[in-house]
Amino acid sequence: MHRLTPWQDWSKYVDAALGADPDADPGARATPMPTLPAPRGPGKGASVAARKEFNRQLSDQMTELSQWWLRRMVTAQQPIHEKLTLLWHNHFATSAQKVRFAAYMAAQNQKLRSLSLGDFHTLAYAMLTDAAMMHWLDAQTNTAKAPNENLAREFMELFTLGHGNGYTEDDVRQGARALTGWVIRPTGQTMVVPKRHDRTAKTIFGVTGNFDASGFCDTGWPSRNRRNTSPDGCGSSWRPIPNRRRRRSTALSPRTAATATCGR
């Protein structure tokens, strides 16, 4: 892309690339995502050998998933969608070493790919309720009786607002209460168990309501994030996509400025 210097040429290239269906790419069709069913756990009282075998299966599946994605990135004829998937994968960083279940990581990878060109709010909510992310940040231990702040804190600090940028410790605590009750089913689907959820009023960023995860995402982030996100911030995410080498930003300014809100 860096060889396309005239604005009109690279603009048409970008429009065509972003408008393409990633699943229709011949390279994508040639590299379907592997099926990675979660192996059956060894259970209580299992032998050392059975536990080792379970761990080996988990490790083998994670290796298979990693190798598949590398093949997909190399094989895709139009790499923009895989670059965007990688960009969001780096932004919503999740540790495969802790998650361990390749099925969770594979589902997250596909969400990032399918939502990579949509609005940031939709993507953020998908990650907020994602099995891999929930496992990584201990969201299953977040209950009305014993709130866990990990997910609420990381969502504000790393994924949306930025460290110390417009939220307080009380906002984190109230946000954690809004996120109580979520669990991961054996199928990898996530859901709320009502009796584990805090159904009392919470006050987040000065707004009081009986917030759940959706309300937290709506009230606890978008309006403030739109004010606090700069064109340069969106531009810094965009620049690695066309080329590794640092380029003058003037040509990208009209597009990055238009997406500076990074919201709905």
Describe the residue ranges of each PLM region.
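N-terminal accessory alpha/beta regions
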Residues: 1-115
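Active-site substrate-binding loop specific to GH73 endo-beta-N-acetylglucosaminidase modules
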Residues: 18, 45-51, 65, 101-264
